[in-house]
Amino acid sequence: MKNLYFLVSFFLFFQFIHSQEGVPFKENKQLYIRGNSILIGNNILGDDATEPLMDNTIANDIVKMEYIDVDNDETTFSSSEASINNLPKNLRIAHAALYWCGLYPSEKSALRKSGNRMIHVGRGERNPAINSILFKTPNGAYETLNGRVIFDSYGTEVFTTNSPYVCYADVTSKLQNLASINGTYTIANIKATEGEISGGGSAGWLLYIVYEDASESSKYFTTYNGLVEVNKEAVELTFRDFKSKEEGIVNTTIALGAMEGDRKIKTDEVSIFDKKIGSFKPLSNKVREEKNFFNSSITMGDEFFTGRNPN
């Protein structure tokens, strides 16, 4: 059975003001192999440097964000971890991509009273090297990654209040040199605004890996890079020029990255066009509701991804 796997990355950006432009999704990689894929990731901002933010009753907007930093390394100002476990050792890595993003209008920001209004006041010039981070593979040491900037709104006329950016690095060769991809991956020095910003702070990373495994079925994998804003208007993404078998059931898996998918905002959804009924069909599972698909969680299928620090 042939299956289709799509990684739509990075990122969907949610805000509820007038429409602004990001960069449209563009095909990045296409593969046809016997194998599978895995995605891991973590946040880089929270209300504590080492402990997870567990209070689901508060809005992201009022959280005074600070860098997560769990690696006990004085040379890093931010770091978080995620792990891969129980994959066979004899896998061949076909493609591995690291993505990171953040809302970064200034180094720090705070909510201040101005007359009868509360306004966000930023301070500290932003570090221009948003594409430069540290990457550590299992049992390895930190090495500098200088990735490609997919999108950065800073200094432009769009997204001026929160200045989102997205970066990407191909790390295929680095993972191919590992004896096993099992273990803990650490990403450090991702940049974002600490404190309170309009809409709330957000930053994080994901690592997407496609691997060959002779025991798996044949699959097509297609990845897309970009950043689009989702507000009151729907954003449509059309998958073109991919192949599938002509008869029988075709199983499809879609992996998505999102910024600003607040748990308390229950208005976002993802739908697939069903040609048989002539309309879009909302997606959902045990951990993602139809009307709150992007709910500030990291999941794999029907389960929360818990192999991370902080979790």
Regions found by a protein language model. Give the residues of each.
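Disulfide-rich extracellular domains of secreted proteins
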Residues: 20-311
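Bacterial Sec-dependent N-terminal signal peptides
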Residues: 1-22
